[in-house]
Amino acid sequence: MIQGFSHIGIGVRDLDASIRFYSEVFGFSEFYRLDFNDNEVAATMEQEGAFRSAMLLRGDVRIELLQWVDVPTSGGGKKPMTELGFTHLSFRVDEIDDLTEAVLAHGGAVHRQTLSYVGPEGSAQTGLLYYTDPDGTRIEVMTNVPQLSELRQ
């Protein structure tokens, strides 16, 4: 039985730069960092080779960043939302404008500079905007998102 959400893993080109991005833009803290040299952990990921890993924390949210050291990687850049599988991270935020400046200053990108508002009529509108991190992982930020306890009533 599922007890809760553990973490999400994100492949990155530069572990140190990605730690800075998620720490300085979104306020994550580095919990630990590990180096794996072609061992059983890499084998569980169906890949041989060395990689570096860092676990970042912010409240109950955990992000594991993975950088392959001696293995060619692919991807990077913005993936289409129509691609199957993982499409984006989404964070509830207090405010969006200051984040945009921080994302750009730390190597990320803003998509279309459009801020949309959605929600049922007569309720507070949820603002949302999409960014990407320096490796193209799409990140949605949302304001005025109801807490789960409010939705369950």
Kindly label every feature range from the protein language model:
Residues 1-9, 26-41, 72-81, 107-108:
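Short N-terminal helix-initiation segments at or just after the protein's N-terminus
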Residues 13-16, 59-61, 67-135:
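Vicinal oxygen chelate
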